[in-house]
Each structure stands twice: as structure tokens, then as C-alpha cells.
Amino acid sequence: MTSSTPTPAPAPEAQAVAARYARRDAAQDAQHYSLYASASALQAQQERLRTWVQLWRAHGWHNLAGLHFTEVGCGSGGNLHDLVRLGAEPQRLQGLELLPERAAHARATLPAALSVHVGDAASAAIEHGSQHAVLAFTLFSSLLDARFRTALAQQMWQWVAPGGGVLVYDFVVNNPRNPDVQGMPLAEVRRLFPHARLHSRRITLAPPVARRLPRSLVAPCASLLPFLRTHRLTWAVKPAQPS
């Protein structure tokens, strides 16, 4: 990371996020989100990746060479792996992760040239205007403090170069079974990035539904039942010229 004046983050919310993750059932998460074991997770990942590519190609990015990317909340590195497979250069990628054990897993599996940093992203030292894209996948829904969420979004927006953007993937409705998350409808993404041009797609068959389907029906139902899509992938673009 390059240096800039960091924006201090409210430590209590970062600590609260870590505590929420500690309460989760790690074994159940591993089963639900395994691309090998879960047909619904594999379908969701493939659909998300196709939509991601469509949004960026429509933006005029026909390849990713020479572009700089940061993922906030990179977890075990799955999206960073996808970026490498899409043609991004590892030395131009970095991940920020709050939880040390997840960051360690990412470092163990990602190319050595790719940097993974542990800590609170809101205080990360990243030069303003240095990133072509910042990724936030199921990040904002984990931040229940609206002021913290807004401050982090503003920080991420500062990192983005004109003509780049923030790629947000999150669910749009509240999960009544999980009080540790909050739905992120398009209106909230617009509030977080008020100066962005938003390009958004509704995707991802509701996971509780998808997990109950036979493997052969997951992809057809994801395509044919748009009213059961629970997530959005939104490309929030920073104008190349001030409006």
C-alpha cells in the first residue's frame, strides 16, 4: 500500500464485526460456501463472475492488464483468485482483511506477488485516486453502524481513480434468521456513493431456496425465477470528469 493520511475508523464497530464472525458456525459456512460441495454456491459464483465481466466490459475494460485493484474484506481470497484468472496482474492487486486467520489462508493460496494486509480497512494507507476498482463483496451488510459504513464508503471512494469505480455485491433484503447482517438495497448503495453512476444487476437465487433444490435444477431456477434473486452486483463508477 502507498501512503496517504489515514481516516481513523470507529474501533468498536470493527471489533463488533470480528465478534459477529466469531459467533458463526465455521463448519456450516464451509459447507454452504464450498464451490465443490455446494451446487448453489457454485451457481452463484459463476453467475456473479459472468455479470462482473459483463459490467466491466460494458465499461470499456477489454482486459485488466495494468489496472490496480483492492478488495476490502477479502476473506480467504476467492475474489482475488478470480481477478487473477480474469487477467489482472498479481503485483497490482491487494486485499484488506480484518480477521487474521482468513488473511493467513488467503496468503497461503494466492500468488506471492499479491499483498494481503490485516487490519481495519478504514485506516488503510492507500493513496487517493490510485485504484481502478475497489471490491466490496458482502461487506456493507456486515456493518450495522451506519456512520461507520458511510465513513468506510467515503474512504473507498477516495481511493478510486476517476473513471474507475467500486464493485459492490450484497444482498438486498434483511435476513430474519441472522440479526448480524442488514440488507443493502440499491437506495443504500446510492446513499453510500452519491456521486457515482450506478450500473446494477439483480442476481443470485435465494440461497435457502437454492440449497434445497436438486443439483440439476439450481441453474435453471436461477435463470427462470428472477423474483427469487436476493442480491445485487453494482458497479459504482466515479466520473472521469467532475460533473
Task: Give residue spans per PLM region.
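Conserved beta-strand signature within the Rossmann-like core of class I S-adenosyl-L-methionine
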Residues: 163-170
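A short acidic, Gly/Pro-enriched loop at the edge of an enzyme's catalytic core
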Residues: 126-134
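N-terminal, positively charged/glycine-rich alpha-helical extensions of SAM-dependent methyltransferases
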Residues: 1-34
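Conserved class I S-adenosyl-L-methionine
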Residues: 65-75
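Class I SAM-dependent methyltransferase SAM/SAH-binding core
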Residues: 70, 78-123
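A short glycine-rich, Lys/Arg-flanked "PGG" loop and its adjoining helix->strand segment in the class I
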Residues: 150-162
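Short alpha-helix
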Residues: 181-196, 201
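Conserved alpha-helix/loop element of class I SAM-dependent methyltransferases that forms part
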Residues: 45-65, 82
